[in-house]
Amino acid sequence: MDSYRIPTKSGASEYVDKRSRFLGLVQPVSSEDEARAVIAACKKQYHDARHNCWCYLLRDGTERYSDDGEPQGTAGIPMLEVFRRAGVTNAICVVTRYFGGVLLGTGGLLRAYTAAAADALADAGISEVRRWLACEVSTPYALYEPVRAAVAALGGVVQETQYAAAVTVCALLPEEAGEAFAAQVRDLTAGRCAVRPVGETERAVPLAGSGL
């Protein structure tokens, strides 16, 4: 399967400029119905706000956005660009604006809606959905850190570490990295340790350092 990126969880932000408050929300969604339910909930919660601008982007290529009364092109599209730059899909962003009495101009609105969306996505984090190889390797304590580093270098994640007479590292690796990891473990341990495949799984795994 092809990998893709989604928000890890719901994320929120607040951006203030000249007394206008911009409240950002980013959530993972899997359909237009889910996205529109989020929009409806935000409009209900912030019914007294001047604007509830939104955008969503789905894996099937569906893109929708609304400036909700702001000047055309100053809200929905800049928010959508945040998702595009991050390579994120199956995601919705709603930015609610409480007007502070001072006009921000086109440039100010572009900056505000972009910042609110980017900060909310950074708070949500980004996960990669792909097929992973689940594996285990038992190693002497002295080689634990090098093995852990090898997992990270190949784009994998350590899910669990078990401590006994030896250290057992339970990891998820991109399926195409399995052979390379096995070779690195053999080299690191001079052939004393081997990788044990446990199976394959499709799941979302948070990316390290995914804050924007």
Listing of model-derived features with the role each one plays in the protein:
Residues Y46-A49, L154-Q159, R186-A194:
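A common structural junction motif
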